[in-house]
Amino acid sequence: MAWTVLPQETARKVADSLQPTMLDLIDLHLVGKQAHWTVVGENFQPVHERLDVLIDAWRLWSDSVAERIVILGALPKGRAQDIVNEGVGDEIPIAWLDGAEAMSYLADRVESVA
């Protein structure tokens, strides 16, 4: 069910183009949480706090994109298996990361999404 005045084919194309963006943002949120949980070292506190802000933003943005997909009459697909199936992003290392490593990794991921 669509809530748009766009022609159906146009709405479908726009929704299809938004789907990968939504998955990227969900993945950024999850990767950010992994970094948040594993950051250590001298700059732990400021990095940990900055990650909270970024993670919240990525989650809200993914929600906004998903809602736009719905408005266009499509079903958003944002399950973990959808992220895996689409091959979104590189895996974050499962390791303790110092602040610079965590932020560098996330900066690279953000750049790949942008």
Where are these regions (language model features)?
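Conserved alpha-helical segments that form or flank metal/cofactor-binding pockets of metalloenzymes
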Residues: 40-82
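Disorder-to-helix initiation segments
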Residues: 1-21, 99
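Structural signal for well-ordered, non-membrane alpha-helices
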Residues: 26-33, 59, 63-66, 111-114
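Short, exposed beta-strand "edge-strand" segments with a Pro/Gly-rich flavor and a Y/T-containing core
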Residues: 1-6, 70-78, 90-97
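Helix-loop segments that flank and shape redox-cofactor active sites
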Residues: 5-13, 28-53, 75
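Acidic/histidine-rich alpha-helical segments that form the ligand environment
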Residues: 35, 67, 84-114
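Glycine-rich, flexible loop/turn motifs
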Residues: 2, 35, 40, 79-80, ...
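Amphipathic alpha-helix face/heptad-repeat signature
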Residues: 14-28, 54, 102, 106-113
